Amino acid sequence: MANEGRIATLDSTVADRLPVYSKLLFDGKAAKGLSFETIAKHLDRSEVACAALFYGQATASPEDIDRLSDLLEISKETLTTQMTGFPNRGQASPMPPVEPLIYRLYEIVQNYGYAYKAILNEKFGDGIMSAICFSTTVDKEVDEAGAPWVVITLKGKWLPFSRF
């Protein structure tokens, strides 16, 4: 099923776990009929980073606030007051997740987490992949039969454990 013209809006079941400004941003997004792709281009950020701002999972720069205010026609003062604190990451969803798509991502880690860990350890040594010095993209591919496929790329700096 094509998704032409449809955009993500604020799910009322998670709204109470998000910052107050999330509703303002999503209302502005919906009123203008903008996709995260369009907003991300305006912010000069990735789609995932842009969406993370809306969910209160990323820090907004002064430039982000200026551009969001301009694009979504939301008071710069309001956004500055509400978006300049520190994000409270990881609070938007219950654990384990109950939303089906988010649960599938959780399930991927459950099923393949140790396999990822083993391969990463063999390639890089004892350490972890940073989720701070990190980027991610979401892309769409279509196979020969016309079926859509999701491509999620995770890129994180390798952080070796230090000896002490």
Curated annotation (Swiss-Prot):
Entry's Gene Ontology BP terms: cyanate metabolic process
Catalytic activity: cyanate + hydrogencarbonate + 3 H(+) = NH4(+) + 2 CO2
InterPro entries noted in UniProt: Cyanase, Cyanate_lyase_C, Cyanate_lyase_C_sf, Lambda_DNA-bd_dom_sf
Keyword Lyase: yes
Known EC number: 4.2.1.104
Keyword Ion transport: no
Active-site positions on this chain: 104, 107, 130
The family this protein is said to belong to: Belongs to the cyanase family.
Function comment: Catalyzes the reaction of cyanate with bicarbonate to produce ammonia and carbon dioxide.
Entry-linked PANTHER family: CYANATE HYDRATASE
Official protein name in the record: Cyanate hydratase
Gene behind this protein: CYN1
